[in-house]
Amino acid sequence: MKKTIISAMILIGGCLSAAAGDIFVSATRGNDRAQGTADAPLQTIEQALKQAREWRRLADRRTEGGIFIKVESGTYRPIKPIYVRPEDSGTKASPTVIQGCQGADVVISGGTAVTGWRRGCDDTRLPAGVRARVWVADAPLREGRIVETRQLWADGRKALRASLFGKDKMQRMKAFDVSDESITIPTPSVDLSRADRLEMTVHQRWAIAILRVREMKDLGNGLTKVFFRQPESRIEFAHPWPQPVIDGERGSSSFALTNALELLDEPGEWYQDYPSGRIYYYPEEGKDPNKMNIVVPSQEELMIIDGTRERPISNLRFENLRFEHSAWLRPSLEGHVTLQGGFRFIDGYKLPVAGLFHKAELENQAWIARPEAAVKARFATDIAFSDCRFEHIGATALDLEYAVSSSDITACVFEDIGGTAIMAGYFGEDGFETHIPYSPAVRDDLCRCLEISRCRINDAANEDWGCVAIGAGYVSDTKIVHNEVSNVNYSGICVGWGWTALESGMRNNSITDNHVHDYARQLYDAGGIYTLSNQPGSVITRNRISAPYPAPYATNHRAFCIYFDEATDGFTVTDNDMVKGSFGYNKPGPSMVIKE
């Protein structure tokens, strides 16, 4: 008996202490028909939320001091996103808290293991010299469907999709022709005539485009014309900003070809065939995939905090949780052409006659959509994430979308993020022309009184290079303070949207005491700190910012420690530690106070 009790204590670990409002969860020893006590825990976080919801509905006295969902170490794989609803709200005196037990490693994962690897492949699309070294596995199934993926992690490292030029390597294009929607490139050294899932990644100033290749025509002079699938082809050649540059001050824009079995020729690369779903992997010398932890993501969203305007969610805490292995699949379905910051075009084009009611010189219009996110919140107040980790994420990691207020992200770590690590605020998406100033009729629709502090963000925007570490759009009274940002392919900390000098909801924002380094690694027109539009009462102070990284394929030199992009106004900028003369300006307003 004593041995049994000791074993149970070891299993429970940091969850031994219990109070009336505690609900216990264990992936390994739990049962969703249990009582949720320390010795009879539930198995899923979803069931714990349901139990907490019932306590609140029935005004159970156990809620008086707060509900604490205490989660033991383990990997939790929700079959759909974990939904948190208005009925899960707490109060200031009785919050709802989802927390990993002290010292626990609680992983909320969208990943699925790839197993059953077989060595050797005689597929003639593979380069002959690597056929004996490539391993093949069937795609995992999720609820009876093949998992289609653009991401694969091998022993915790994101593997490279098969590419013509290798990791982060590109080649300069020769022509960009709007008339027939084509890009002319040097003829590839590999026969790609059977590569029906081939993609071209296009480097275009401050953003990228991912275009699915429809056809390649050899022009016979060392050049090849490439045509693309719809809808991305129309969008790529219609929108004016940003488009590729031909013969710029640092050369023409660059491209990479990816996602063909013919290109699988380097250790660490992989490819998924379609429609079979088979996954091909070329491991490093001496590695056996059957002895490795190889994971693909099977869902894009891990948690949705989903309030409404009429019934916002409130008083929730998330502590000591790890979110990992979320997917980003959209480019495989319809390509990916972005305006800025990872926001893809729904439509965009040059105006034949310039001018809109609010901006006489505007010569283009654009309608955009928000990137996917692993964890997102909308219509919520008094929400807090603390001591959480976000790793191996396909798109955005954590997004405070709409009408989120009085909420904090504190001491969280973001590592290996395909898109933006932290996003907050409206960005003029979902039918709202993106250059029109946003000033909501209902003030509470604006994201406000947010604080992002003491977070560490490394290796963000590693899949969509045009994303950022921290991106805040239409926000007010928001503090971004004491964060470290490193290794990001575009800008570090970005605040503002709209390219407008007009008043909107943006004001009283503070970017203070942050350390930003190793940014602008691939794209320029960037800043360690980057701002847009009029934001009265805002400050940028005491930040430490290194010089921009020398991006190898940028077509100009426009990258700065602090970049005041179009119509930035209302900021007081003082006491920042950076290279002298490292400000960039694009039509700043008259109310800027800048002290170098």
Task: Go through the PLM ranges and name each one.
Residues 63-69, 94-96, 450, 467-468, ...:
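Residue-level recognition of the N-termini of beta-strands and the immediately preceding loop/turn
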Residues 314-325, 361, 381-395, 404-419, ...:
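Right-handed parallel beta-helix
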